[in-house]
UniProtKB/Swiss-Prot annotation:
InterPro entries: Ras-like_GEF (IPR008937), Ras_GEF_dom_sf (IPR023578), RASGEF_cat_dom (IPR001895), RASGEF_cat_dom_sf (IPR036964), Ubiquitin-like_domsf (IPR029071). This is Rap guanine nucleotide exchange factor-like 1. GO terms for biological process: small GTPase-mediated signal transduction. Residues 424-660 form the Ras-GEF domain. The keyword Metal-binding does not apply. The lineage of its organism: Eukaryota, Metazoa, Chordata, Craniata, Vertebrata. The gene is Rapgefl1.
Amino acid sequence: MKPLEKFLKKQTSQLAGRAVTGGPGGGPGCCGGPGGGGGPGGGGGPAGGLRPLQRRQSVSRLLLPAFLREPPTEPGLEPPVEEEGGEPLGVSEEPGSGGPCWLQLEEVPGPGPIGSGVPLRSPSSYSSDELSPGEPLASPPWAPLGAPERPEHLLNRVLERLAGGTTRDSSASDILLDDIVLTHSLFLPTEKFLQELHQYFVQSRNVEGPEGLGRKQACLALLLHFLDTYQGLLQEEEGAGHIIKELYLLIMKDESLYQDLREDTLRLHQLVETVELKIPEESQPPSKQVKPLFRHFRRIDSCLQTRVAFRGSDEIFCRVYMPDHSYVTIRSRLSASVQDILGSVTEKLQYSEEPAEREDALILVAVASSGEKVLLQPTEDCVFTTLGINSHLFACTRDSYEALVPLPEEVQVSPGDTEIHRVEPEDVANHLTAFHWELFRCVHELEFVDYVFHGERGRRETANLELLLQRCSEVTHWVATEVLLCEAPGKRVQLLKKFIKIAAICKQNQDLLSFYAVVMGLDNAAVSRLRLTWEKLPGKFKNLFRKFEGLTDPCRNHKSYREVISKMKPPLIPFVPLILKDLTFLHEGSKTLVDGLVNIEKLHSVAEKVRTIRKYRSRPLCLDMEASPHHLQTKAYVRQFQVIDNQNHLFELSYKLEANSQ
């Protein structure tokens, strides 16, 4: 299990615990005060044997407890069931056919209550937020495609529908286009998808008159929308780039045949020029600047730079440690496999003789600060962004695997105040929001789909999303670390007040990711058990923190959070793990293919969730940040936190501060 997934499991389990046990200052209701207590657990010790890395498990198994995996059973909403005979809900027998027929998706003129006779979609095809109490169920705005289709035929059906103008309005056509572009990879690989599009256009050239023109317009519209959506991703898919270029040349040759498409073909020309397609191997690639990841060398000039999106071909620097804690620094592609990384290590170590034998003798291990060790398989790739906050890569032989120990803690108790005591809450909150907005903007909307649906499609890197999840974990541990490293009781109380103020300003900035992370950090069991410290907190701050806990309460499918975010207007930063949970609910609540036929409802629901993410980023973020003398210093501090992520160590610090607190 990856460290970021452990974080999701740990934090959501902790939130669930508040529904049963309240901490100091807790009031009646689902949630108490600053979280429930807990014994020194978590963190885990060294593994007993070589354990292969389990990459990217299903999020529904990670976001525990059960209410994060199962649909809510609110009054009037029934959980997904199977009809008699074992047929999945949403599939019925077509009269006279003897086979299944997909549930017809008729246009619903307006929201109607359950039981009113209005056709409703299967609950299993909705994300968990769509099943929130009081929210009407609605079918897609476009009419059914007709007979059920297999993956290889669905694209032609959509193109024929667009060419025939059978959609009811232009907005329905736009949604239909967006649905198929965003979700085609769930049932058809991108390269195959483009091949089908290419073939459809070639066949359309043999059709004369308005019908042929309509087909070409449909093909061009789909290609334009595809390029708009996939900008920045196609450089990793060389095969797709070649097909696009071939189709582009065919379209440009046909431009003289129909003047009506001149504007669209001009736009296509501009898009093809701007889309970053993969450079052929025979050409000389341009020199690339090495991009910094989190916590790499802690260079001020690197952390102050505006974050840009990572792609698999980007190069980074990374340290790989030896069992004696010496290290070599390698330069590697972000998407490099474990075998490639070990090859670079052996080259650095100057293992010139018997290279094959030497490389096979080395293994790559991820070692967490808790001592947990995970053996990385040679075929694994993109391992750099899957590491935990204070995890490191070790290269060793199998004989020395058991002797591996984590590096010494990088965060030490130092005399005097740390940086957090010297900065203003507003400055910290604004810099948190600004940095997290940069990271959120770097995440391509399709990374959310790829992260959850990786089992049904070809692999594509999700490095930017993984880094954003790591950052959420980092902020949570930063809050706990700063509180537990403060030995003076009075200053600890001031820190609690400061973090509550930071959470309030982040909420005001509509940065719900930072807000959640700070609240969860204060709810860390090692912090919430400090009863004497919490008792000294002024009542005004206790009440404010109770409200914040209520907002992060997972009761009733995170109802409080969903109500708050539904009233916000962009720009805003959502709590990203909850989006992944909703997508996982969609993924596991209904099949993508039933008897080989594509579940259109599921595709539309997934696309709706992606469009929600798109809406959050539809406007630029504008923060009023004064250029104070300490502006750059605060910015650097916020972007390179030094934290303790070993829960056992956090509990040790907590018991040193208050040994008898419960």
